[in-house]
Structures are given as structure tokens and as C-alpha cells.
Amino acid sequence: MQPTDSKTLTNVDATEQANETQTITIPPNKKKSKPSSKTRRRLKDAEPLPFTIDGLSHDGRGVAVYGNGFGETDGHITDKHGKKIFVSFALPGESALVKITNSRTSFEEGDAVRITANPNPERVVPPCPHFGVCGGCNLQHWQPDAQITFKQSVLAEMLVHQANVAPDHWLEPVVGDRLGYRTKARLGVRYVVKKETALVGFRERSSNFLAELNECHILDPRIGFEIENLKTLISTLDSRDKIAQLELAMGEHLPELPDGDQPVALIVRNLEPLSDGDIDKLKVFFAARNWQLYLQSKGADSIQRIALRDTDDLSEQFGRLYYQLPEYDLTFEFIPTDFTQVNLSVNRQMTKLACDLLDLKAGERVLDLFSGLGNFSLPLARLVGETGSVVGVEGSEAMTARAADNARRNGINNTEFYSQDLTHDCTDKPWANQGFDALLIDPPRSGAWEIMQYLPKFNAERIVYVSCNPATLARDTKALLEQGYRLTHAGVMDMFCHTGHVESIARFEKISA
């Protein structure tokens, strides 16, 4: 193929007909931390350069190196021998023409604008027409099973690098819905005067600009295929240029609930009060879809539910959403601003896996740290039975109260929930001195480093650690090994398919003296 300055990528789909291709539009780089204006002009005018992709970075970008003819054209001989370049949309073994988008002293970044030879057999046609522009996901060009295998390799590498350990057993990856799975998100909104239309969606890659979307294949289809209608709605509002964001939350429809069940909620963040006419338009749109409507003008305390019909009960600030864990006969109630796992199908499998790994027996006592709504606490309580107990500890008082409510609604009487700042040693609290057979940790991305400092005082025989960041899991694993635990199991979960995000789970067992 001849070199090209086109900003399109031809994806060769090895799993389809040999001649089938998919074109992905790649926008100009709009990164906030830009090189100098002179460097930007040089990068913009530069021809794409040929590279062979040697491997992948932890976020799924291809890695190539200047030298031996790579990064050179007939009219351009490079002096960057050995310098790495991270290439979006490229897979190992492929030869690609790469448009440089960012140049730094120690590395460069670029986009594969054409695969010229040796397309990776795991390359597929991205299902979403906006892939390459939208920053919502970055791996749709790669077969999903290959993505999750790669994510396990990322976890394995980090465990070796930071803790010098491998688990006794690798778990089978947990996979669920890979499209239409995301039930929580924040979508940016911007009205473009020149185009006389609103944009609704995620930001463009490496940019603060919103991508121009008509649909989203990652979002639950109840919202993902309503984006065009949301754009049209916002464009008709008097305050169309004052809507900043839509926060969405979705639950499951429960057939046993009355007709008032509204499993989709949107919070409209408006920068100034809306006119009565605008509110009426929103009410008509939301009522037709049986969605919950909220307005938010300032902070979280300003969120206001809007009645769509005369029978709506506004005695509380929020309506209710629900999800279920059928394995344990549990129904969870939550409000739109609560933290919940975004992939309900993976969450069902994840909770079962965590419970199985703890290998609980009737009568045992379990401590659940960062317990949230009780997503793990309530299944654990089912397993230990009435003679056992579960203590859930969570930083948010509101979430702690919601967990206790969920326990009562599900007829569970062997749980206790406490609100506590877990970054400080809390082992002097009465709840912490009950003695625990097993412990579950599900911390934020920052991990549980502070907890690692006082965790030995709980003296739990078994620990399951659920992580949304393999780097902090690996760091905390090292601490647990030093405290006399063995890493028996580890694995990854496909919570965020088509992104570089790695969700993982690990089991530790106390080594007998």
C-alpha cells in the first residue's frame, strides 16, 4: 500500500470475509497538554511512518520502536533509534502506517492510520460506528476473548513486578454482556450554535471536546439508542446551551412491581433554572419512556425529582431503582446517585465467585470492608446462615443506611452495618473486635493500603480482594504476603469490555504457623 495522510484506519477483519474492511474516522489530536505550537504544526504536517507492532502497553495500545527501518520513509531518516511509540488501534505483529500525535523526550504516541500487512487474526470490525472518535472505549477492534486474556496477562505481570508472586491457581475469566452492558454513566452535553444541534455523549479520545454520537453500543440500549432523540430534545429547549451533563442510572425491571416501576433515571444538570416550557418538554419526553426525571442546578443537595404525572410520589428526594442477585434470592434497592457496578451480568457472576472463594460455613463470621449497598454482604449473610454473622463497613453514611434497608427488605437478620473512615485504624471499634473467620475487601481504585497496615489485627483465615485497579491490588498483595498470607487464586472479570479497564479478584489464605 502507498503511504497516506488520511486520518482513517482500515481494519482488516480476519474473522469475516478476507476482503471485508471497516473504516474508523480518527479526529485530530486535541490534547490539553499539547506540545509547542511549532511541534504541533510539524506533527500535523508529517507523513505517517511505517512500524511493526512488537507488543502491547497495559492500556491495550500497540508498542513499536524506532530503528532498523521502522519509523522511516524514503524522504525521512530518523535519529530516534530505540525510542518507543505507543500506537492506538494496533495489535501485535501488525505492520502499520502510524500518524504521530504526540512527541515527548522519552516516548511518542500515535494512531495506526492503516494496517499495511500481517493483520492480527484477532482483529475484528468494531461494532460501533463512532469507534476511533469517541473516547468511551478503545479496544473494539480486538476480539473480546482476546481482550480479557490480555487483561489477565496485565494482572499477572503486575503481581510479579510488585509482589514477586503468581497465584497457586488462575481463575477462568468472568465474562458477561459485552455490548449494551453499561447501566451507569455521565454523558456530556454541548449545544453547537453553528450546527444548530446538541451533542450528547462521551469526550473524544485525548480531548475535552465531545464526540458527535448518534448511538452508543456500550451503554444499555435503553439509553444507548436514545442518544439521537436526546440530542433532538435538548436542541428544542430554550436553555439548550445551559445543559451541561446527563447522569444516567438504570436498574432491572421487576414484573412484581406496580405499573409505576421506572427502571431508568436521568439527572439533567442545568446551569440555570429551566423555563416552564422546557420542563414541560422534558416531562413529555420522559413520561413517554417511563423514565425518572431529575434536575440538578448545583451540588448533589440541589437534585430535584420532577413529577411526570399526578400520581407520582415526591415525598422523598429520589425514586427507586432495583437489581437482583437471583442466585441468593436478593433484590437490591438503590437511588440514581448510589455507586453500583455498571455491568449487571458480570456483577451476578462476581458476587457468586467471591462467595465461593471464601468457602464459608454455617456459623462463621465475615467482615465486608467498603460494603456499599451490601452487594457482597447480603449474599455472604445467606451463606453463613442465622448462626453466623456479617459486618459491613462503608465510608458513606447514606450507603450504610441503604445496605441496612436492603437487608431488612430481604428478610436478613444476621448483618450489621457501620459507617467508618477506613483510611484510619478502626480496630478499637466494638464491631472490629468480634473475631472474623473471613474478610472481603472491595476498595476504590486507590486500593486498601491504609487498611493493610492494621488488617493483621482482624486475624482472618481467608481474604477475598475485589479490585478495579491491578496496580494497587499488586501493591496490597505484597503487604498481605509479608503479613503471612498466601495468594491462592487470582483472575480477571470483564466488567468494562472494549476498554483498557481491568477488574480483578484475588483470594488469600493465612499460612498456618
From Swiss-Prot:
Q: Where does [4Fe-4S] cluster bind?
A: 128, 134, 137, 216
Give the span(s) annotated as Disordered.
1-54
Q: Where on this chain does S-adenosyl-L-methionine bind? A: 341, 370, 375, 394, 421, 442
Q: What does the record give as the function of this protein? A: Catalyzes the formation of 5-methyl-uridine at position 1939 (m5U1939) in 23S rRNA.
What protein does this entry describe? 23S rRNA (uracil(1939)-C(5))-methyltransferase RlmD
Does the keyword 4Fe-4S belong to this entry? yes
- The annotated regions of Basic residues compositional bias extend over 29-43
What superkingdom does the record give? Answer: Bacteria
What is an example of a GO molecular function annotated in this UniProt entry?
iron ion binding
Keywords of this entry: 4Fe-4S, Iron, Iron-sulfur, Metal-binding, Methyltransferase, rRNA processing, S-adenosyl-L-methionine, Transferase
Q: Which reaction does it catalyse?
A: uridine(1939) in 23S rRNA + S-adenosyl-L-methionine = 5-methyluridine(1939) in 23S rRNA + S-adenosyl-L-homocysteine + H(+)
Enzyme class at the top of the EC tree: transferase
* UniProt-annotated catalytic positions: 468 (nucleophile)
Residue ranges with Polar residues bias: 1-22
Q: What is the lineage of its organism?
A: Bacteria, Pseudomonadati, Pseudomonadota, Gammaproteobacteria, Moraxellales
In its keyword annotation, does this UniProt entry include Nucleotide-binding?
no
Q: Which cysteines are joined by disulfide bonds?
A: none
